[in-house]
Amino acid sequence: ANANYRDSDVRLTNPVRDARALAEELRRDGFEVVLKENLGKEDMQRTIDQFAATVPSGATVLFYFSGFGIQVNRQNYLIPIDARIWAERDAQQDGISVERTLGQIHAKGAKVLLLIIDASRKNPFERRFRSYSAGLSATAVPERTVAISSASLDKAHDDVDANPSMFMSELLKEMRAPRQSTAEQVFLRARNGV
C-alpha cells in the first residue's frame, strides 16, 4: 500500500489503513500475509520478486495494491512513492507493470491468483499530461486469475477519507458473510456494493 507520494501534493489516507484491515482479516482466516507500506520502485520490485519466489506450487495467492495507478496504452502501472511522472513514458519507466507482476506470480505455479487493485483514484500525476484521470484498463489476466478493481474500468474516483474506504468496507463485509461464495462472487458483490 502506497500513500506518501514524494512528488505529489496529494496525501492519501486510505491505502495503508485498508491494507492493514485486509491483512488482519486474512490473518484471522489463517492466511500468511506479507504487508508492505510506502515503497519506492526498487523496494516494490524487490518485494514482488521475493514474494513470487516463495509462492509454493499449487497455492492460492492474493495480491493487493492500494495507491495510485495509471494506464498507458491499455497497460496498468502501480505507482511507487518515489515516482516522478510528467509523461506517459515516465509511468512506464517508474511504475510497476500489473501484467508483468501477474506473470511472475503465475510462473511460480500459483494455482489461483486473486488480484485486488485499489488504484483507480484521480491522481496528480496523470493531470500533468492528460486533461482527465483515465482510471485503469482491463487487465489481461492469465487463466485461474480473478481480478477486481475498486472502480469500473476506465473510471477514476476521488479518494474519500473513510476508515476503511467504502470499497474495503464492502470487500470485508462480503469476505465475512456466512454464505458459501467463490472469490469471483465476493469480488462482484463488493464492487456492486460501492
What is each of the regions a protein language model found here?
Residues 1-10, 27, 82-85:
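Active-site histidine-acidic residue metal-binding/catalytic motifs
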Residues 5-20, 160-163:
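Glycine- and acidic-residue-enriched helix-capping/strand-helix junction motifs
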Residues 10-15, 72-80, 136:
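Short beta-strand-loop
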Residues 39-66, 70-128, 163-167, 172-187:
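Caspase-like (clan CD) cysteine peptidase catalytic core
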Residues 1-4, 151-153, 172-179:
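Cell-envelope and extracellular/periplasmic
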Residues 26-36:
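Short beta-strand elements in bilobed, periplasmic/extracellular small-molecule ligand-binding domains
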Residues 113-162, 169:
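Extracellular S/T/G-rich loop segment that most often corresponds to the catalytic His/Ser-adjacent loop
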Residues 187-194:
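An often Trp-containing, charged/polar helix-loop segment at the C-terminal end
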